[in-house]
Curated annotation (Swiss-Prot):
Family that this chain belongs to: Belongs to the scorpion calcin family.
Signal peptide start-end: 1-27
Region (Essential for stimulation of [3H]ryanodine binding to RYR1): 57-59
Tissue expression: Expressed by the venom gland.
Name assigned to this protein: Urocalcin
GO molecular function, one term: toxin activity
UniProt xrefs under InterPro entries: Scorpion_calcine
Subcellular localization: Secreted
Predominant place of localization: secreted
Amino acid sequence: MKASTLVVIFIVIFITISSFSIHDVQASGVEKREQKDCLKKLKLCKENKDCCSKSCKRRGTNIEKRCR
């Protein structure tokens, strides 16, 4: 009985660690997307610090704002 409990604990720990590593990979993908989107003419507009020029307007149906 003790051996099966240890195996179950090991499996739960393994699944937890693997889910954290998958989450980190997805987060790095989001960071890469943000870097790609921040091109010279299509920089994302920040509310506090506008990375664009003063003409920051909505583009498309997305909530995020981009420069023209």
